[in-house]
Amino acid sequence: ISRATNSAAELASGDFIAFFDNDDVLTADALAEVALYVNENPETDFLYSDDDKINELGERFAPQFKPDWSPELLLSYMYFSHLSVVRRELFNDIGGIRVGYEGSQDYDFALRATEKARHVGHIPKILYHWRVLPGSTAQSGDAKPESINAGLCAVEDAISRRNINAIVEQPEWAKDGGLGI
């Protein structure tokens, strides 16, 4: 996924790169909302929106209304998820998506990008419908166990870069609930 995302980013021609999965659905106004936000907040380097889930019948459920930017919360879990948008210059400056974090490559990227971003923005609207398929992380955070380990590594790297002395672990309640970190 990391290499494919980086290859796709090389082909893109705009000032911003939006990340979304091929089987998910953007709202009709998603890109317009992103453009409006960036025009009103020109220092924005990283941007995310609220989202919900969509099943095979097209029924939407489980809306995720996210808080505004919180660096402390992002160290706790990947609350950005979908829709995420980054300024191309920042994407290139930090080396894009790192290989070796598959399953949590987006989390690792978000941690690194927000460390360097001038402004991290939140559009408090559902702009993304995350498709729930059997065996996907949209259905369960423990559907892909390797994503947990990759997420732990991403946070360990982040606290090391920030010179924070801490132990990174997945809480028991998250393990028991089938959640990520």
Positions of PLM-derived features:
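Short, flexible, basic/aromatic active-site loop/helix in glycosyltransferases
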Residues: 56-79, 92
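Conserved nucleotide-sugar donor-binding
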Residues: 13-14, 80-95, 132
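Glycine-rich, basic loop-to-helix element that forms the pyrophosphate-binding segment
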Residues: 1-12
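Donor nucleotide-sugar recognition loop
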Residues: 95-111, 146
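Conserved donor NDP-sugar-binding/catalytic core segment of glycosyltransferases
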Residues: 25, 29-61, 133
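Short aromatic/hydrophobic "clamp" motif used to bind/position activated sugar donors
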Residues: 17
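Catalytic donor-sugar/metal-binding loop of nucleotide-sugar-dependent glycosyltransferases
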Residues: 99-101, 111-130, 135, 154-175, ...
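Conserved active-site beta-strand element of glycosyltransferases/polysaccharide synthases
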Residues: 46, 55, 85-86, 103-104, ...
